[in-house]
Amino acid sequence: MKKVTGQIKLQLPAGKANPAPPVGPALGQHGVNIMEFCKQFNAATQAQAKEALIIPVIITVYQDRSFTFVLKTPPAAILLKKAAGLHTEKKKGSGAHKPGKEKVGQVTRKQVEQIAKTKMQDMTAGTLEAAMRTVEGTALSMGIEIVG
């Protein structure tokens, strides 16, 4: 079995990894072939590239400088912004400046449930209901109102 020398966590745009920061410096420190990672990551995330999603990735680096990586689901905040119509290719909207007082968008309970189902594999929540509450909390802290 190969010995693990490091683990790198990054959040990269789907299908658009390139050797520029943050990818190059993070992988360069561990002696990983940067272009090889970029090619593999872009191929693995090509399907999500059209949606302009940010994909968290955990890269495990081994002693012989080889690597493996695991793709996670996009952050709940990105999925919520997309559902509320705040996140597009050209417009990278942010949440409210004063959450609780200011509302920047709305999502339905059905959309919250869909996001919770998507995120379940990466969450510690035991039930769909618990995952939905977590996503609702994220929405409220961003100033996104939940309707329906």
From Swiss-Prot:
Keywords: Methylation, Ribonucleoprotein, Ribosomal protein, RNA-binding, rRNA-binding. Part of the ribosomal stalk of the 50S ribosomal subunit. Interacts with L10 and the large rRNA to form the base of the stalk. L10 forms an elongated spine to which L12 dimers bind in a sequential fashion forming a multimeric L10(L12)X complex. This is Large ribosomal subunit protein uL11. One of its GO terms (biological process) is translation. InterPro entries: Ribosomal_uL11, Ribosomal_uL11_bac-typ, Ribosomal_uL11_C, Ribosomal_uL11_C_sf, Ribosomal_uL11_CS, Ribosomal_uL11_N, Ribosomal_uL11_N_sf. It comes from the Bacteria. One or more lysine residues are methylated. GO terms for molecular function: large ribosomal subunit rRNA binding; structural constituent of ribosome. The gene is rplK. SUPFAM superfamilies: Ribosomal L11/L12e N-terminal domain, Ribosomal protein L11, C-terminal domain. Gene3D superfamilies: Ribosomal protein L11, C-terminal domain (1.10.10.250), Ribosomal protein L11/L12, N-terminal domain (3.30.1550.10). It holds the Pfam family Ribosomal_L11_N.
